[in-house]
Amino acid sequence: MPTTFHEIPRKRPTTPLLDRANTPDGLRRLGEAELETLADELRLELLYTVGQTGGHFGAGLGVIELTIALHYVFDTPDDRLVWDVGHQAYPHKILTGRRERMETLRQKDGIAAFPRRSESEYDTFGVGHSSTSISAALGMAIAARLQNSDRKAIAVIGDGALTAGMAFEALNHAPEVDANMLVILNDNDMSISRNVGGLSNYLAKILSSRTYASMREGSKKVLSRLPGAWEIARRTEEYAKGMLVPGTLFEELGWNYIGPIDGHDLPTLIATLRNMRDLKGPQFLHIVTKKGKGFAPAEVDPIGYHAITKLEPLDAPAAAPKKAGGPKYSGVFGEWLCDMAAADPRLVGITPAMKEGSDLVAFSERFPLRYFDVAIAEQHAVTLAAGMACEGAKPVVAIYSTFLQRGYDQLVHDVAVQNLDVLFAIDRAGLVGEDGPTHAGSFDLSFLRCIPGMVIMTPSDENELRKMLTTGHLYNGPAAVRYPRGTGPNATIEKDLEPIEIGKGVVRRQGSKVALLVFGVQMAEALKVAETLDATVVDMRFVKPMDEALVREIANSHDLLVTIEENAIMGGAGGAVSEFLARENILKSVLHLGLPDVYVEHAKPAQMLAECGLDEVGIEAAVRERLELLNR
């Protein structure tokens, strides 16, 4: 069984077996008796690597044995291995030729936090969002059949990801086309897994064997000729298996269910996977693992060790006092939610599995009957809110920008068309740093702005966020407040619950010739640039309805308008300004600054903003360049 480690090594560990198994070909040259030692070395290497870079932690520790078994049994990359979400894929990266590059994990120009097709042939499908693996692997299995190939398709999905409807859509479809594929349920929640042990492991070996499969198919042919006999036999088999395994649901959908088995028992994993590799049709293997396995602190606190920051060197010089910063925007939201809930009993809070990330912990404890975590089910979260709003509740949907994309139809069809009172608190808007393009909130202004009746707000600091949340809550109709990851500029927060006037911007600095129209948190950078250029700075506040009277006034008194937003330029807030000017036949030079028409790769947030020209240096340079053109 796995060795348990108690601290993260600060020096690279000695790993003689892992040194020979940097690729799956090297791994397959090892003897089975060596694999458990390899698992200890790989776990130690993962502890060291993530300690150096920071990153997702607990999930990878929990699939060390599974990763080894999959690459040992299957002919990757010819056999297609698809990881769901990708939090658990660091051991996979180490074993597929990227060990020496793990020092660059999640850094600019380094390897990504998630599997990427452009990074390795072993990364067969790019992931980041949850619950896509079964659909992708099914598509690969169907393509293999059309190409007369016998390559395998394997999806590894966690029990949390199975809460999403998309996963069940794929589970329902695969038996309809009799796909030759394997789904592995990595169950690390322990909620449906009490039957793990020697008997269950033994049963899994029997049920996954060729002998059992042949006997089952032969019996089916014979008994199918006898009226009622096959149905009796099928029910008897289900009853016998059901006493030991929780797989009836998957069997009813048409999958050959095996398990649950201990996901840290390498010999059993390898034997079971070898048996299942040769079976035809849709196969489902249920394994039970422990998130953070092999690192004692993570086993005790798997949520706290979901991801970690990098270790500071032991000999690091004393750090300078940190510059005072404001609270996290998510923290401001969480405090407001509790305050408003105390003032308004109609308020309910909804989140799709982001209680900690969106800062709903305090709300869930103070108002447990008004708190709803719907798990990874964004579509359901939005329509649930719509149903509540129909009955007089005031739902607040706390959701990351990137995940709101999954509930877009529900936002339009179920909320906006009916003009329901639902407030969307959109966290992680804009660039998010090391998690890269799959998690960036680059598009919400673009896809929200076109929805009739939607009020869209972009706070420039913590106090503005609190006021806008109140404004959205009191508005009779759908509203959205989008705010970034990280901390604010430490603005003074007014504790009252007073709204601001909808559709009204504010001039923060009066200048001449150049006007910077800011939608969001680039206000601090804009004010610094304005001091150098003597520019006017406008806090636009509202993307929709936009303060058209203020835009007209500014356009008539300045030579150049510069819109600034941390959203895609295409379809974004700046576009609303240009559309208004064109509609009013106001001819004015407008410069749009925002996210370019590319996926911005992972890096530190400051590096990403600089790359996009949204830091102080980039904004000033772009404005000066445009002024030079105007002055020619």
Curated annotation (Swiss-Prot):
SMART domains: Transket_pyr. Gene3D superfamilies: 3.40.50.920, 3.40.50.970. It comes from the Bacteria. Transmembrane segments: none annotated. It catalyses: D-glyceraldehyde 3-phosphate + pyruvate + H(+) = 1-deoxy-D-xylulose 5-phosphate + CO2. Pathway: Metabolic intermediate biosynthesis; 1-deoxy-D-xylulose 5-phosphate biosynthesis; 1-deoxy-D-xylulose 5-phosphate from D-glyceraldehyde 3-phosphate and pyruvate: step 1/1. GO terms for molecular function: 1-deoxy-D-xylulose-5-phosphate synthase activity; magnesium ion binding; thiamine pyrophosphate binding. Its EC number is 2.2.1.7. Its cofactor is Mg(2+); thiamine diphosphate. CDD domains: TPP_DXS (cd02007), TPP_PYR_DXS_TK_like (cd07033). Binds 1 Mg(2+) ion per subunit. Keywords: Isoprene biosynthesis, Magnesium, Metal-binding, Thiamine biosynthesis, Thiamine pyrophosphate, Transferase. One of its GO terms (biological process) is terpenoid biosynthetic process. Residues 1-25 are annotated as: Disordered. The keyword Magnesium applies. GO terms for cellular component: cytosol. Thiamine diphosphate binds at H87, G128, H129, S130, G160, A161, N188, F295, E378. Mg(2+) binds at D159, N188. Catalyzes the acyloin condensation reaction between C atoms 2 and 3 of pyruvate and glyceraldehyde 3-phosphate to yield 1-deoxy-D-xylulose-5-phosphate (DXP). Belongs to the transketolase family. DXPS subfamily. Homodimer. This is 1-deoxy-D-xylulose-5-phosphate synthase. It comes from Pseudomonas fluorescens (strain Pf0-1).
